[in-house]
């Protein structure tokens, strides 16, 4: 499913379709795409405090906008899949992470 969506997003970038929201994002450029990713990430955090359906909807929006970002930066979805696969089974401890303060 994600592969199909990513391919459709790339197709919109290569073959613009008038009235397409995806093309609107590409036309506005990287700053607009980044703004949308940030907005959607914030909405995911808020939705997580509410009901499951809202969270599902917001995670879906964020996922779509992240795929648009990858397409804008010409990063294949396979690169993300490879990175995740490379991390599989690796141990991580809290000491490996920087502390997040003031939440």
Curated annotation (Swiss-Prot):
EC number: 3.6.1.31
Subcellular location: Cytoplasm
Pathway terms, separated by semicolons: Amino-acid biosynthesis; L-histidine biosynthesis; L-histidine from 5-phospho-alpha-D-ribose 1-diphosphate: step 2/9
One of the GO biological process terms: L-histidine biosynthetic process
This protein's GO CC annotations: cytoplasm
Superkingdom of source: Bacteria
UniProt keyword annotations, A-Z: Amino-acid biosynthesis, ATP-binding, Cytoplasm, Histidine biosynthesis, Hydrolase, Nucleotide-binding
InterPro entries linked: HisE, PRib-ATP_PPHydrolase-like
One term of GO molecular function: phosphoribosyl-ATP diphosphatase activity
Catalytic activity: 1-(5-phospho-beta-D-ribosyl)-ATP + H2O = 1-(5-phospho-beta-D-ribosyl)-5'-AMP + diphosphate + H(+)
UniProt-listed CDD domains: NTP-PPase_HisIE_like (cd11534)
Family statement drawn from the similarity comment of this UniProt entry: Belongs to the PRA-PH family.
HAMAP family on file: HisE
Protein name as catalogued: Phosphoribosyl-ATP pyrophosphatase
Organism per entry: Listeria monocytogenes serotype 4a (strain HCC23)
Name of the coding gene: hisE
